[in-house]
Amino acid sequence: MKIADLMTLLDHHVPFSTAESWDNVGLLIGDEDVEVTGVLTALDCTLEVVNEAIEKGYNTIISHHPLIFKGVTSLKANGYGLIIRKLIQHDINLIAMHTNLDVNPYGVNMMLAKAMGLKNISIINNQQDVYYKVQTYIPKDNVGPFKDKLSENGLAQEGNYEYCFFESEGRGQFKPVGEANPTIGQIDKIEYVDEVKIEFMIDAYQKSRAEQLIKQYHPYETPVFDFIEIKQTSLYGLGVMAEVDNQMTLEDFAADIKSKLNIPSVRFVGESNQKIKRIAIIGGSGIGYEYQAVQQGADVFVTGDIKHHDALDAKIHGVNLIDINHYSEYVMKEGLKALLMNWFNTEKINLDVEASTINTDPFQYI
């Protein structure tokens, strides 16, 4: 399996297009044409993680957090530059799966909920998928070759189906004027043409490409086409809602997930003895969604990186919070390993996958 093949597989199951616009996901360092010798999953790509990959003979690291986030201005032999230089020197490919793994139905938040032993887990804060229905009008004799070109360039595809067009016949009319150079008709004379309206669906990211292809392959000098926006609720969403088996107190639940996640500290906001049943989870830094979680029926909102003023606001408004630290996302190492092994087995790909044993939590606890 080459890196390009791995990227295609990852994009199929955890689409990079579902990442936030500000994020930096995908192949950050590497060569798509090289063969994968093994995959190491990690929360962060630190120097220790790179050394671990080298020791195992694996040339591919898939990290959750992007090593390259802001603009890199230099690659010196220290700090992040040292890590990047070592990756390049040892021909190690680095792939980041960040917010696209966060919003995935099988991603980080699902992994956290399962690690906490919760049930009835479902995605919340669903994204809106944007599609376009494309309409254009073309002379009857040109329909076949035109559709062929669109299909060859990846348009008019629906899941496992290609060449997905709808046609309806009609009669078009126009009058070329001035410096027009018409394919059909004469200057200053109204022309009537038997035309076919062709309709097909595209994803939002294909819009500019579709416009380019229509202009390139349409026989008319100035083709007419429409893009009609359609929105649908996506399967992807930031966070999950889940439940405990039996109602328990806020303090007992906080202690329980601290033990199950095996993390050194947990903080919570709210009355210790308050009973909870439904839990909303956004791993990493999810503050900003706590009030929405309550509106969706959550008794407590679980996330990390909670700041003092956000916690105080929540307390004043009676919103229960549990801070499980950002590093709690480490569960994705084993979680992603399991997903990869399942995908590889399905595709009959024989490739070693291991979860990094390196603890990349920058904090020390006393």
From Swiss-Prot:
Binding site for Zn(2+) 1: H64, D102, E329
One Pfam family this sequence matches: DUF34_NIF3
GO cellular component, one term: cytoplasm
KW DNA repair (keyword) present: no
Keywords: Metal-binding, Zinc
UniProt GO molecular function: metal ion binding
InterPro entries documented for this protein: DUF34/NIF3, DUF34/NIF3_bac, DUF34/NIF3_sf, N-reg_PII/ATP_PRibTrfase_C
Ligand binding (Zn(2+) 2): H65, H326, E329
Annotated TM spans: none
PANTHER family: GTP CYCLOHYDROLASE 1 TYPE 2 HOMOLOG, NGG1 INTERACTING FACTOR 3
Subunit text: Homohexamer.
Stated family: Belongs to the GTP cyclohydrolase I type 2/NIF3 family.
Protein name according to UniProt: GTP cyclohydrolase 1 type 2 homolog
